[in-house]
Amino acid sequence: MTQRNLPTTLLSPKNVLRIGVWNIRTMYQTGRAAQVAREMDRYGIHVLGLSEVRWTTAGKVTLSSGHTLLFSGPPDEGDAHRNGVGLMLSRQSVKSLMEWEPDNERILTARFKSKFQEVTVVQCYAPTNVADQESKEDFYECLQGVLDRTPKRDITIVMGNMNA
């Protein structure tokens, strides 16, 4: 999914970029997205990776605060509200968003414009240790595929809940 208007830069020698990760356990509650946006502002975070979003399908939501939530969950709205990842972007960082891809319910990638090199952020939510071996292997194969597709010159940030 590509954003049409060309962005400002996310990262430059003069700007500090603050990135965070939060396993929020669910965003399937009224007002939860607004609460997350307030916490981002409180700590001055520009890009916040979210695990266990528990929203179905994939999409982009702009909040009344100006923050933008990119999310990826199970493909069918009839599925249980489980897993899911997201990236909450500040008003400043959304301007530099070039494109994003909801790879599956556990991996989401976003690419940002920066001063010298583009920045690719990969948000992950790995299966837990008690998950079956096939689920774990599928996750890591998908993650490797995402990293293989990432432009080699990009600054790549892999973050999330790795469930070690």
Segments from the language model and where they lie:
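Short, well-ordered beta-to-alpha junction loops that form the rim of enzyme active sites
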Residues: 160-163
